[in-house]
């Protein structure tokens, strides 16, 4: 009598239909054949249990996932699995992940498992809104048509009082920074309450906009429980802000989907910080790729998301970051494009290479590379803007520095250093 049925989920001659969701996995079997391991993934992520059953509903039979591709790759294998849409609730990222990234990661029959990519058909994708603004919308409300947007986190990222933070914000915005940004763990504290900060910072922003005749914005961190985030978003909108920042991984997908609806009602763009992503994206053999995370975030509707730099201090090589950025900026049915954010170890000397690698549709966030300028944050901001202008004009930084003392001092300090 047949007991296990994992191979029933493997059909390498199967051709997926246009209305099926395709998922690509890397896996390493543990004590079972590659075919059985792949079948176990397909079974557990669709309708399966470990054994044959007394009765099988007709709908369940039609909902069986199918492994249709299996090839050796390094120490493991690449499998492609087709999932009928009957397995998925419309418009629910959390239900999708409970299937394709759920129990399968705990199976003993696998040494390693990594979700590489997924391809939703339009019939599934149409239930997601994507970004409210996207690249085009953000460029319009910021009034920046061609160059990369600039952003800075006041460093150190903790410890500022509201008044101190406001003073730094004034200097940074006045020096040419477009977007002031809170860091991932900077929310609300006895020494710097969110409610006080939001009011003070937007007053400063209005002053700088009048003085510089440039649009300025504040990526204020509203991360918290859902009820707290909603209240904070309302405060931002009431003060005339047009952005909020959310730590999307620690906040969770369900909360992010809810806040996408809230921010649309309030007219707010979402800046997505990816803190904690490396817990499951960094190991090349196990977890979920940052590419897949970026795709999920775009479906839900963030307007910009951190992707890496390839030249800074954070993990992520050029090919990985380039692939993510290219996807975020590509046409994808009705889903708007998303601004990639380069951050982590950036300074003026790296601008020509960064822009050469990734182009001008980019948010360039430099924290220490602005705040660490010998003459202070305003000079650091101007040095960054001058370096970006030089890169776009095709002018060598050393040549540009002859007319920019701020850039010269930045180059004297950091040169073209790539932080480790």
Curated annotation (Swiss-Prot):
Keyword Magnesium tagged: yes
Species per Swiss-Prot/TrEMBL record: Pyrococcus furiosus (strain ATCC 43587 / DSM 3638 / JCM 8422 / Vc1)
UniProt-listed Enzyme Commission number(s): 4.1.1.39
Similarity remark: Belongs to the RuBisCO large chain family. Type III subfamily.
Signal peptide (from-to): none
MF annotations from Gene Ontology: magnesium ion binding; oxidoreductase activity; ribulose-bisphosphate carboxylase activity
Protein name per Swiss-Prot or TrEMBL: Ribulose bisphosphate carboxylase
Transmembrane segments: none
Active-site residue list: 155, 273
Gene Ontology BP term (one): AMP catabolic process
Site (described: Transition state stabilizer): 313
Record key words, sorted: Carbon dioxide fixation, Lyase, Magnesium, Metal-binding, Oxidoreductase
Description of how the protein assembles with itself and partners: Homodimer or homodecamer. In contrast to form I RuBisCO, the form III RuBisCO is composed solely of large subunits.
Cofactors, names only: Mg(2+)
Catalytic activities: 2 (2R)-3-phosphoglycerate + 2 H(+) = D-ribulose 1,5-bisphosphate + CO2 + H2O; D-ribulose 1,5-bisphosphate + O2 = 2-phosphoglycolate + (2R)-3-phosphoglycerate + 2 H(+)
Binding site residues for substrate: 157, 274, 306, 343-345, 365-368
Binding site for Mg(2+): 181, 183-184
Record's cofactor remark: Binds 1 Mg(2+) ion per subunit.
Cited function: Catalyzes the addition of molecular CO(2) and H(2)O to ribulose 1,5-bisphosphate (RuBP), generating two molecules of 3-phosphoglycerate (3-PGA). Functions in an archaeal AMP degradation pathway, together with AMP phosphorylase and R15P isomerase.
Further information: Because the Archaea possessing a type III RuBisCO are all anaerobic, it is most likely that only the carboxylase activity of RuBisCO, and not the competitive oxygenase activity (by which RuBP reacts with O(2) to form one molecule of 3-phosphoglycerate and one molecule of 2-phosphoglycolate), is biologically relevant in these strains.
InterPro entries linked to this entry: RuBisCO, RuBisCO_III, RuBisCO_lsu_C, RuBisCO_lsu_C_sf, RuBisCO_lsu_fd_N, RuBisCO_lsu_N_sf
Modified residues (N6-carboxylysine): 181
Any Pfam family: RuBisCO_large_N
């Amino acid at each position: 009598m047949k007991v296990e049925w994992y191979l029933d989920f493997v059909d390498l001659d199967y051709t997926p239909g246009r209305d099926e969701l395709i998922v690509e996995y890397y896996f390493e079997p543990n004590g079972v054949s590659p075919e059985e391991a792949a079948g176990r993934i397909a079974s557990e992520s669709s309708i399966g249990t470990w054994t044959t059953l007394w009765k099988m509903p007709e709908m369940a039979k039609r909902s069986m996932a199918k492994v249709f591709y299996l090839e050796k790759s390094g120490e493991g294998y690449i499998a492609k699995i087709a999932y009928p849409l009957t397995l998925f609730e419309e418009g629910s990222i959390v239900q999708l992940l409970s299937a394709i990234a759920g129990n399968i990661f705990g199976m003993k029959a696998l040494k390693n498992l990594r979700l590489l990519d997924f391809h939703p058909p339009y019939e599934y994708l149409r239930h997601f809104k994507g970004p409210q603004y996207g690249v085009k919308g953000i460029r319009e409300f910021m009034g920046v048509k061609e160059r990369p947007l600039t952003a800075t986190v006041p460093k150190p990222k903790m410890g500022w009082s509201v008044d101190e933070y406001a003073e730094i914000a004034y200097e940074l915005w006045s020096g040419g920074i477009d977007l002031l940004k809170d860091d991932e763990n900077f929310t609300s504290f006895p020494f710097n309450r969110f409610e006080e900060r939001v009011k003070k910072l937007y007053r400063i922003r209005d002053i700088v906009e009048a003085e510089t005749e440039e649009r300025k914005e504040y990526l204020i961190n509203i991360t918290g429980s859902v009820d707290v985030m909603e209240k904070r978003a309302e405060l931002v909108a009431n003060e005339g802000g047009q952005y909020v920042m959310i730590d999307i991984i620690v906040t969770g997908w369900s909360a992010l989907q809810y806040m996408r609806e809230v921010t649309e009602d309030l007219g707010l763009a979402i800046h997505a910080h990816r803190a904690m992503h490396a817990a499951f994206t960094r190991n090349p053999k196990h977890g979920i790729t940052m590419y897949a995370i970026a795709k999920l975030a775009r479906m839900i509707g963030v307007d910009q998301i951190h992707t890496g730099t390839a030249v800074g201090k954070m993990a992520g090589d050029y090919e990985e970051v380039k692939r993510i950025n290219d996807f975020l900026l590509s046409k994808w049915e009705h889903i708007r494009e998303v601004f990639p954010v380069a951050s982590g170890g950036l300074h003026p000397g790296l601008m020509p290479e960064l822009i050469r690698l990734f182009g001008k549709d980019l948010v360039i966030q430099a924290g220490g590379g602005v705040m660490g300028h010998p003459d202070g944050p305003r000079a650091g901001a101007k040095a960054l803007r001058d370096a970006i202008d030089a890169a776009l004009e095709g002018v060598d930084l050393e040549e540009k520095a002859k007319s920019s003392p701020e850039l010269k001092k930045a180059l004297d300090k950091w040169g073209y250093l790539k932080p480790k």
